[in-house]
Amino acid sequence: MTDVVSDFDHVYNIIRNNYNLNYYLNCADRSNNVCTIKYLQERKSYFCCAVDESTGRCVLHRCVLIVFGTWLDKKFRKKEFSGGDATCGGGGGDGDQDQDAIDERSNIKGTFMIDGRFLSFPNVMMNNNILMHNFYDKLYSKNCKRMFLYGNVDEEKRINRAIQLVYDDHEDVLFARDVYAKDYVVSENLNETLETYLRSSGKWEPLNFLFDFDKNQTDKMFDRIKMIMRAEINYSIDSLSNKIIYKHAYLTHLLYRPVLKMYQASKIDSAAAVSESNGSLRKLGGNQSGAMYPKDCKKIVDTIVNGKLIHVISKTFSKQKKNFLNHQDNSSNNNIEMCPPMIKYRVGNEVVRIINDNMRQDMLKQEYDFVKFVDSFFHGEMTVAGKKFFLCRDVRLPNVDYESIAKKFKDLIESNLIVRRDEDENGSGGDDDDDEWLMIAFNNRPTTFSCKRKHLVRIVYEFKRKRFPVEIKLSKSILFVNHHEGMICIRKQVRINEKVNISALLTPYEYHNVESIIGQIGARIVDVDHVSALMSKTLQYYYRSHLHIFATIPVPKLIVSVTNLKNAMPVIEYDDVEWNENRDMFIRNLPVGNSVVASPGSVHNNKMINLWTLVRDSRLMTAEDPYIPNVTLPVKLFNNKVNRLKGKMVYASKSKTPLVKFFKSESNNFVDTNEGHVLAMAGVIVSNVKINWTHDGKRYKIETCKNKSFYIFKIYTFLRKIRSQRIELIDAKLSTLNDFVYVKFSIVTSTNNLDGIKICGIHGQKGVMNSSEDLTEWMAEDGTHAQICLSPVSFLSRQSNFDYIERKYVVRGGDHTDPSAVRYPMFRIPYMLFNNTPEILQRIPQTNYTGHEKIEGTRLDQWSINQSFAGNRWAEGLQCVRGGTNLPDSSGEYKVLTSLLHCNNVIVN
């Protein structure tokens, strides 16, 4: 898992400390430097400015994205963090504490805000093009390896050109493709060109001393690169060893870097100009206040708003034209909208895989090395083979830090564990001596350093201890040391020589591969195999007392359970004291949409409630739906509906000043209609100009009348009437922007009638609540009674089990003194509630592109068919596939099936 808040804290510190910039909410009004969540939710976006105090100019103008929970957020919302910031000056009153509690309950840390919506950006997985990788090109052959050498940096055009090296295994030929896409065979006369690219990488400047080649080494450059590219790659393109995952914070930092570099260059130029004129040059021309790079800052904001941060890495993505927008494809906009309160630990752990449209099914394979790195159960969109998934709890995505890598190399040079060595010192005949030496390559590039094989254990110890983010591979006479952007690591203990334990970060290659350096030096990974190792922190949190079910109930039921977790209504705890004292505040701070409010004894977590469950039937009521609830449950359903009505003021004369006044309803003003609806009044608007309202006439009712001077608009809204419904709050608010008028209308309703609500148990048994029954006659000795009944047929057919679950024994009628009375077990099971909302209709495309679009909830596209097949396929079927041809080799179908089954924790030997 990753910590988005600490990652962004790091980015803000770099901008502040390395470039001496100060943060302001608005560089035009620096005295007003505070805001609130309520202010931001009025369709505001949460960006700030980074200002150079010495000149007063704004460098990053209204484009620094502020993430909730970071120190920068606390600086601007310090009034809301009572006692949370040194500059609070004592904080505020009760309102501040309430807001702090809302922050905690809504779990908004790690998200950002655009247009009043909470958003999060997932980590992005791509193929690793930084290191050498297998490559297939029509120009060469099927068995090639490719590597990009960066280093031809053009500061003026702000690009880092790369040369592409392609090595053909069969022919032992090295090809190169230069920046103008000319192909040529590499020979010794290209050594100097290669050296140019290697000497200054353009990516890891602090490590340039590793590539300080002398004449002898330059002459051997061609052979050294060939030697590196001969190293065998024993994993496929679909392996996690061949992937990198980009963090949100890293991509954001890359987005700001070109502007910050321009600013740094301009500072150096202006300092030089001032010194040349002996300090007499005071004004450097141009506007000395305002934004320095307005166009660049506008591009930054557009990139963030459109969810196209990945374009910072890959120019190819930004050049791709999409003719058909696919609603199931995430590559168009990667921003994920979050409705608070969010699922815990979701932000920062969600990964989306950028995939190529024409290779969709191939790219979805999960190889064996995904195990323990990617959550085997929780796939955010129920995509089993996974375009979208979660990282396991022990997985880390380390920050790129070439300075610390350079320091580590210098320490090893001081210790004489690695030395600068020229092969010609020992002549060409010292084969035995050469076997003793290992050439060191950094990120698959040859360096000027080598080490002795006998020092290997010590070098691995120095590199891997204290969770240092470095990958080490050993291939024949080359020691590969890798540290680059997007590294994926897992936190583990490694025991060296059966004596020394170190805390290490291991990559998928080091952890899973048979040729891992851990095995080659005789070390071993100290591992405790438990089902929790296959899970993300999200799943460990929500299922922490029921982890045994992941190994004991069928996979399809687990998929039902974890998918419904995502869709479940939020659960909010309350007690009678809080309800009586702070009822109004409690209602106003409810999340938008449906929520479950339950007593403290019933709340399991913010998505589940505990109910005492009896396995029984009553008059075959559970034949269709497996649940019968008690007539009274310690649960209330609340609905917080927010409508926004927009109108435009129409007036011919520009000299006329429009006047608008809004009178909202003093009390909860509503009336029942005959058609099963409720008509609620928002209020009355009086205006001296006409207002044209944008609405379809179905949700709102607007009555208009006018006299000589004014127009009067009475605004009503309709809501559906349900049984036992109570209207808790009707509130309305008016705001204006230019010629537009906005009315925000909130209605909070509650009900204790749960008939027809969908419910899902933690074991994946879902159904609609049937008509309720009095279950108080099923009484335990301590007075606890049954709260819900579960169908016995459903329990058996879903292969559920109630092991390790709290239980009590009940007697019908509650007379425990009768020794002949039958004792029935009753179980305390966590449940999720969710309702059928018509929001799914918004996701159904109006036009057909492929003919496989979702229609009325039935999923018939290739994607969903594939997922259903994968999720419900049993392992036994594999033997038929393998044995069908009576050949020892596995068939193609077998490989696809094993790949899909890795997602269901079935490892096939």
Swiss-Prot record:
Keyword Nucleotidyltransferase: yes
GO cellular component: DNA-directed RNA polymerase complex
Similarity field: Belongs to the RNA polymerase beta chain family.
Catalytic activity: RNA(n) + a ribonucleoside 5'-triphosphate = RNA(n+1) + diphosphate
Top-level taxon of the source organism: Viruses
GO function term, MF aspect, one: DNA-directed RNA polymerase activity
Annotated EC: 2.7.7.6
Lineage: Viruses, Viruses incertae sedis, Naldaviricetes, Lefavirales, Baculoviridae
Record organism: Spodoptera littoralis nuclear polyhedrosis virus
One of the GO BP terms on file: DNA-templated transcription
Function of the molecule: Required for late and very late gene expression. May be a component of the novel RNA polymerase activity induced by baculovirus infection.
Keyword terms: DNA-directed RNA polymerase, Nucleotidyltransferase, Transcription, Transferase
InterPro entries: DNA-dir_RNAP_su2_hyb_sf, LEF-8, RNA_pol_bsu_CS
Protein's UniProt name: Probable DNA-directed RNA polymerase subunit beta
EC top class named in words: transferase
